[in-house]
Structures are given as structure tokens and as C-alpha cells.
Amino acid sequence: WAHALAGLDARAVVLAAAFDRSPAPVAALLRLARERGATSVLLTNRRVGPLPPLADVLLVTPAASQDAMFRTRVGTLVVLEALLDSVAAVHPELRRAAAVEEVFTALGGYITC
């Protein structure tokens, strides 16, 4: 994602998501957004930790029970899908999912590095 972030500026909104842990790449992304003047939104199930202070907007989707052995990510995924659908509805010119799927189909699958 270095290529996509190279032009990051104050007009951008960065959406980051983290569940249970605080991955270093997410922290780096939030710091980069702040340095470039972009607005950052963090979607997470934790109100405290190293990531929330780095975000301009914090969206918390707590698990049903923090004590459960297997916590669900359903709430986080629902909010993420709602945000992406809302952006696509307001800015149809930013829709890329169909184009990405066309590339995957043309290449015969996903390419990983």
C-alpha cells in the first residue's frame, strides 16, 4: 500500500481497523495520516491502548463479552461495510470493487507477494 499512500494529503480520510491487537503497521498508518494532515478513523473493539490516541475519530465495536474465548468480529465488519457502502453511495466515482474483481478474474485469482 505504499503506492496508494504516497499521495496522502489533507484531503484524505484514512480508515484503519484493528481487533484485539495493536499491529505496528496500523500504528504507522495512523501516524502517517496525522503527519500528512489527513483525517484518520480507527475502527476497533478497544477503547484504550496505543492505537486510539493516534486516531482523529474512534469507532468502537465491542465484542459481546470481553471474557469470551472466541470474540466475534461481526460488529466490526458490519460497521466497516456500512462505512464503505456510505462512501460509495455519496461518491460513486470512487467505486473500485468491480474494477478490482475484473482484474482478479483476468489474472485467474489473487496475486500475493
What are these regions (language model features)?
Residues 1-90:
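Glycine-rich phosphate-binding loops that contact phosphosugars or nucleotide phosphates
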Residues 90-113:
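Internal, active-site/partner-interface "lid" segment
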